[in-house]
Amino acid sequence: MKLLIDADYIVYKACAGAEDEIDWGDDVITVVSKFSEAMKNVERDLTRIKTEFMWDTPDMILFFSDSKNFRKKISPDYKGHRNRKKPCGYKRVIRDLRINYEVIVMKTLEADDAMGIYATAHPGNTIVSPDKDMRQIPGKLYNLTDTTTITAEEGAKWHMIQTLAGDQTDGYSGVPGIGVKRAETLFNKEGYSWSTIVKAFEDKGLTENDALLNARLARILTLDDYDTKRQEPILWTPKAAVATDDGTGLQDESN
């Protein structure tokens, strides 16, 4: 068993915690960082995670986002408010982590997507991330508090819920006035289907294209969503993501 680590989060937090400011007066303030402290912060957090799985002595794989993001081609506004530069030492920490850890960065993908692809290509590993988006990926998820097992059906449902609820942090709005709780209530009443999603968007004066855009932005990639030969994402379509209804309300509209 391997631990698939969302290292973006860990390294960003570690480097930000090692920053300090020097106010030179007048109009000059500089930001400085102690590299050894940033590395110590990272190693501390990785050790804490590994300690949670000591009985299995797992290997760790650290996943980082690429500097380019395919979602920005779909929607230029995606994460548009996240323009702050990375904290001091961020790139150097990643470079040094490669010495002792396996590090994975996939072209144009976020760390979430790379973890989703790896986890579905190699079942039996555990994703480590506090990001609720990872509830889309079937398998084990450790959110830094608890470990849960997510089924493929639960993952598909969570993607639908996020499509309606949106994510203001990531810059896609979903359906105005609908959050996670209201989305769950709506799906439980109307069924987990693409038609339910489209109707919710249309009821607010939006279109099916708006629904599809939100679904594609919300989707965390799995192996089925990735062209390994061309090394590029396969954009999500409703037909590809629905499942056979087994009494839980997830409906197949592909026929």
Write out the residue ranges for each language-model feature:
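Domain-level signal for Mg2+-assisted phosphodiester chemistry and nucleotide/NA-binding surfaces
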Residues: 1-92
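Extended two-metal-dependent nuclease catalytic cores across DNA- and RNA-processing enzymes
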Residues: 28-30, 56-57, 80-253
